[in-house]
């Protein structure tokens, strides 16, 4: 892991070392509030596994914002096994998370943010309609900044990979200079040009979300709701509880 000496194990705990349960989490949140002089909101980000239970615990512990990260989320520093075979889909997690906040009386007090595989305004609009208050973007912004750019194909080849499938964030050998501490590689990244591309990407996403909201007759993107959606497959309906197109009721096994 970057500066860790060869032969020295990287400590990666299965649990967060600062808390083991809901009570410890509440204490940690209060510690963070004191450390920041109560000036910033406290976010809790979690993988989407048991959203109905986990979101309730986080909300009751005092979080201002709960971020649910679905299985489609990408990261350059996780094993392929975990990337491909853990977590539940983002869209199915949102509905359960929203219902959890409703059931524990935290809607309006705790914000719900959806993350994981959100690339376009269409993805974001679906998340908002399913109950998310906002969305979080990771890989999409990185790609806009220049991640996986084909400009340095020889460097990708040396890493045994290719543009579009790099997965070397954790090595510090990022060919485009984004995920690295190497001064020479960092020179390849033009932060001003990257920022301009990311700004255009976010602007385009916002325009897409706005257009979809208008198409649904809504004056605000935050007025999008489940009734604006229809599932095009039995699987999508079963995952999300969204009504099936043509029969106007959710699919039930």
Predicted features along the sequence, with ranges:
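C-terminal extensions of enzymes
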Residues: 185-253
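Glycine-rich phosphate/pyrophosphate-binding loop
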Residues: 1, 13-16, 245-249
């Amino acid at each position: 892991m970057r500066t860790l000496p060869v032969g020295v194990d990287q400590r990666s705990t299965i649990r967060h070392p600062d808390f083991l349960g809901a009570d410890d989490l509440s204490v940690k949140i209060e510690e963070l509030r004191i450390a920041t002089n109560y000036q910033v909101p406290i976010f809790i980000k979690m993988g989407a596994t048991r959203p109905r239970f986990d979101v309730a615990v986080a909300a009751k512990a005092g979080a201002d914002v709960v971020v649910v990260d679905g299985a489609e989320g990408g990261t350059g520093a996780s094993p392929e096994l975990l990337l491909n075979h853990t977590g539940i889909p983002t869209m199915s997690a949102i509905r359960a998370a929203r219902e959890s906040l409703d059931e524990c009386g935290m809607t309006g007090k705790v914000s719900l943010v959806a993350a994981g595989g959100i690339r376009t305004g269409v993805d974001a609009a679906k998340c908002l309609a399913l109950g998310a208050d906002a969305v979080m973007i990771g890989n999409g912004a990185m790609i806009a900044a220049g991640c996986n750019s084909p400009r340095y194909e020889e460097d990708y080849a040396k890493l045994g990979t290719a543009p579009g499938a790099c997965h070397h964030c954790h090595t510090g050998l990022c060919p485009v200079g984004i995920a690295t501490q190497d001064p020479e590689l960092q020179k390849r990244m033009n932060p001003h040009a990257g920022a301009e591309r990311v700004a255009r990407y976010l602007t385009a996403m916002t325009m897409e979300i706005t257009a979809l909201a208008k198409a649904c007759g809504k004056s605000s993107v935050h007025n999008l709701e489940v009734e604006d959606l229809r599932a095009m497959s039995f699987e999508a309906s079963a995952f999300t509880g969204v009504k099936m197109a043509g029969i106007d009721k959710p699919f039930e096994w």
